[in-house]
Design a protein with these regions (language model features):
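Cap/lid segment of the alpha/beta-hydrolase catalytic domain
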Residues: 1-24, 73, 78-82
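Extracellular ligand-binding interfaces
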Residues: 334-412, 428-433, 438-439
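Catalytic histidine neighborhood in serine/cysteine hydrolases
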Residues: 137-154
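Primarily recognizes the serine-hydrolase "nucleophile elbow" in alpha/beta-hydrolase
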Residues: 28-90
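Extracellular carbohydrate-recognition regions
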Residues: 279-320
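Surface beta-strand/loop "capping" patches
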Residues: 168-213, 229-237
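Short beta-strand/loop motif that positions the catalytic acidic residue
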Residues: 110, 116-118
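Short carbohydrate-recognition loop motifs
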Residues: 314-343
C-alpha cells in the first residue's frame, strides 16, 4: 500500500498515517537494543524519510546521538517555497500533520546530541527550512549543522567526515572537538562595500572559511551558489569579513557561511535572506560570460545530478559527481565531470540570457568525442532541448556557436530564445573539457 497523501496530511488523525507505523517499528528496535547486555550505547542515523522517523523517536528512546540526513520536517510545506513571500494557508489535515507529525514539532523535545546534514539544490527535502528545525532543537543538547555545497543535491565528503567525528565523540566516547554553529551578519563597511561578517568558534583552530551566495530566491533546487573563500587577511581573531558582490539590479540575495576546522569538522550557518536596500560600491555588473575557468575555477558548474552516481540517492560518489578542472591544449584549464556538467547560472539574474542572444563556448578533448548541450526551462529538468556537436580529438580548443533555434526537443520542437532558461548541461561521451561559455 502506498502512503500517498498521508506523508504530509493527518487524515483523519496521526494514527492513520504511515509515520505512526514507521515510528513504532523504530521505537521497538531501539527498545530491543537497550535490553541487550552487549550494547552499551547506540545511536540512530536516518536518510531522507528515515531521518524524519528518527526525529519522531528521539524524544522517547535513549539514543547516544542522532544524525538526520536531508530530512528535518516541513513536509506539509511541500511545494511552498520559503523566500517567495507568499502567505501559507493550510487545511485542517495539514495543521494536524504539522502539530502531530512534522519533525520540527518534535525538535524541542529531542534530548540527545544532534547532527543535521543537508544539501543545497536538493529537490527531495526543504533545505531552505532545515535550519529552522535546527534552531528549535532543545538548546540543552549539543548540536551541529552542515550544508553540502556541491550544487547537485547530494551529500559530499565534508558531511561524511562530520558523521565519523560525531559518532566517535558520542558513541565511542573519544575526545573529538565538535564546533558551535557559524554566525553570519551582512552589513555595509566603512568603504561603502557590502560585506559578510562571519563569526567562528573561538575555541577552534580554523582551517578554511567562506560564504556561498545566490541571487535566485525561487527555484530552490536550481540555484547557482557562488563560493567566496575567506583569506587570512580577512580573518581577525574569530571573525572574518568577506566581500559580498551582489548584482547591481538584484533586490534580494541568499547567503550562508561555512567553516572547516583543523580536525576536519565542518559547520555552516543558516541561509540568510539579504535585502539590498541601496547601491553598494562593490556591486557587480551584468555578465555575458556564464563560465570561465580562469575567472571562476569551479564556481558556476557542478556534476549533473540526473546522471550522478550516488548511494541511497543521498551520498555522492565524489569521483563521478564532482566537477574538476583539467588542462587542455596550451595548458589552459577546462571543467568536466563524469556525470556531465550543469550550470544554473542561466537562472541567475546576473547571467540570464539577453534578448536574441546566441551561445558560444570552447571545448577540448584528447580524443574524438560527441558533446551534447542541453537547456532546461522547467525546474524539474524534465523537458530537454538539445544540440550536438562532434569534437575532433587533440589539437587546439574548438569554438562553437549556437542560436536558440539549434536546440530541439525529442519531438522536434525548437526554442525561440534562451530567456527564462533554468539550467544548461554539457554531456560528453568522452572526457570533454568546457571553457569560456558566454552569450554573444
Amino acid at each position: 500500500m502506498r502512503a500517498g497523501s498521508h506523508l504530509e496530511k493527518a487524515e483523519p488523525t496521526a494514527r492513520e498515517t504511515s509515520w505512526y507505523e514507521w515510528a513504532g517499528v523504530a521505537r521497538y528496535a531501539a527498545k530491543f537494543l537497550s535490553t541487550r547486555e552487549e550494547v552499551t550505547k547506540f545511536g540512530a542515523i536516518g536518510l531522507r524519510t528515515g531521518g524524519e522517523v528518527v526525529f519522531k523517536i528521539a524524544p522517547y528512546v535513549p539514543l547516544g546521538c542522532m544524525i538526520s540526513v536531508c530530512a528535518a520536517g516541513w513536509l506539509a510545506y511541500r511545494g511552498r517555497e520559503k523566500f517567495t513571500g507568499e502567505k501559507q494557508v493550510f487545511d485542517e489535515e495539514h495543521h494536524r500533520f504539522i502539530a502531530g507529525l512534522d519533525s520540527q514539532s518534535y525538535a524541542p523535545y529531542v534530548n540527545c546530541p544532534v547532527l543535521l546534514l543537508s544539501a543545497v539544490n536538493d529537490s527531495k527535502h526543504d533545505y531552505d527550512r532545515v535550519f529552522d528545525t535546527f534552531q528549535q532543537i532543545n538548546p540543552a543538547v549539543q548540536k551541529a549543522f552542515l550544508y553540502s555545497s556541491h550544487g547537485n543535491g547530494l551529500i559530499g565528503s565534508h558531511s561524511i567526515a562530520d558523521i565519523d567525528l560525531f559518532l566517535d565523540k558520542y558513541l565511542k566516547d573519544m575526545s573529538v572537538f565538535v564546533s558551535d554553529t557559524v554566525d553570519l551578519a551582512v552589513e555595509e563597511d566603512e568603504k561603502g562595500d557590502l560585506v559578510a561578517k562571519v563569526t567562528f568558534d573561538k575555541d577552534a583552530e580554523l582551517k578554511e572559511c567562506g560564504i556561498f551566495f545566490t541571487e535566485q530566491l525561487s527555484d530552490a533546487h536550481a540555484r547557482d551558489w557562488t563560493r567566496v573563500l575567506g583569506s587570512r587577511a580577512d580573518v581577525r581573531e574569530n571573525v572574518a569579513t568577506i566581500p559580498l558582490s551582489i548584482y547591481e539590479k538584484s533586490s534580494r540575495a541568499l547567503v550562508y557561511a561555512f567553516a572547516n576546522y583543523s580536525n576536519n569538522f565542518s559547520v555552516t550557518s543558516k541561509i540568510q535572506e539579504v535585502v539590498i536596500a541601496k547601491p553598494y560600491r562593490n556591486a557587480s555588473l551584468k555578465s555575458r560570460i556564464i563560465y570561465s575557468a580562469e575567472r571562476d575555477s569551479l564556481n558556476g558548474v557542478s556534476g549533473f545530478r540526473r546522471r550522478a552516481r550516488s548511494i541511497a540517492s543521498c551520498f555522492a560518489d565524489s569521483k563521478g559527481v564532482d566537477a574538476k578542472l583539467l588542462p587542455g591544449y596550451g595548458g589552459l584549464l577546462g571543467a568536466t565531470a563524469e556525470a556531465g556538467l550543469v550550470s544554473y547560472r542561466v537562472n541567475e539574474p546576473r547571467y540570464a540570457a539577453p534578448e536574441e542572444a546566441s551561445l558560444r563556448l570552447d571545448a577540448y578533448c584528447k580524443e574524438d568525442a560527441h558533446l551534447k548541450i542541453v537547456f532546461y526551462f522547467d525546474g524539474n529538468e524534465e523537458k530537454a532541448y538539445s544540440a550536438e556537436v562532434w569534437i575532433e580529438g587533440g589539437g587546439k580548443w574548438k569554438s562553437f556557436c549556437f542560436d536558440a533555434s539549434d536546440f530541439k526537443s525529442q519531438t522536434g520542437e525548437h526554442i525561440d530564445s534562451f530567456e527564462n532558461a533554468v539550467s544548461l548541461v554539457f554531456i560528453g561521451d568522452k572526457e570533454v573539457l568546457i571553457n569560456n561559455v558566454l552569450w554573444i
